[in-house]
Amino acid sequence: MYKVADIFCGAGGLSYGFSMHPYFELIWANDIDKDAILSYQANHKKTQTILCDIMQLNCHNLPCVSIDILLGGPPCQSYSTLGKRKMDEKANLFKEYLRLLDLVKPKMFVFENVVGLMSMQKGQLFKQICNAFKERGYILEHAILNALDYGVPQIRERVFLVGALKSFKQKFHFPRPIKTHFSLKDALGDLPPIQSGENGDALGYLKNADNVFLEFVRNSKELSEHSSPKNNEKLIKIMQTLKDGQSKDDLPKNLRPKSGYTNTYAKMWWEKPAPTITRNFSTPSSSRCIHPRDSRALSIREGARLQSFPDNYKFCGSASAKRLQIGNAVPPLLSVALAHAVFDFLRGKNV
């Protein structure tokens, strides 16, 4: 049994795959966000959670210092001033990550972040990060993974950097992509239609699971979190007017918003995967999140589905707190693939 810890754990998306694997044991998880920690506790009951700033973690308050695998990566803002003389508090988070690495001395770590990290400061920043890991005795492999290629009905690219101690002789191989891609229709087609301001929880599911994605997420007898915020009449009219894939630029002048980017006030595609889900997946003025069949933005259940969270996964806090946890998460299905790849490496399989 390999011991795992997760820092910047959020609601537990990256932990999910390791928690489901029979040879991994999640020992502890840390985050500074109270709602995220409550969500993590609700779904990973055997794991000890630590609610505090990462700077407060030390050998005295960690339930287990000896860890085999460390998961997590600091928020992308942490790197914006790295390498400059003046470091802000968020930039220090990466230094704290390195401190934790020195403290727990894991055999491996899985580090995740936005793809833009690789191009910051003309690529020099990513080199600095890699060098900091290499100085601690880790051999590195990195790749840009698209969650779409691992069963998630969403185009979502993130950079993953996996480190292993030099004592390992084999090379780490990232999980192979699968050939099947899922669309919004595949992922959401069993949910009842609702309109602006309506709650569809009592309506239940429309049909049985008819694809492997629905078989994965449909592990709850009752539908929950399937409600839509109430919008004003003009926004409802905008959403009614748009067709699949259209945005504000396709609207008649009397309805066209005067501000907003191209992908705002935009309808999703029913027969295509979702674009990247963010914390704003219920805010048409901030992202492409209008349902292709109903005149409304996505519900919390739909946002969670498009991230591949099972229907029985619990999110705590306000509606905005739940959206933040969902939008920031590593999709669980991607974490399942990563957990298997890490296990294969530890067992010396050259996949």
Locate predicted features:
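Conserved SAM-binding loop of SAM-dependent methyltransferases across substrates and taxa
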Residues: A11-P22
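Class I S-adenosyl-L-methionine
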Residues: C59-I67, Y79-K258
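Conserved SAM-binding loop
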Residues: Y40
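Conserved proline-anchored active-site loop of SAM-dependent methyltransferases
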Residues: V4-G13, I54, C64-L82, M108-V114, ...
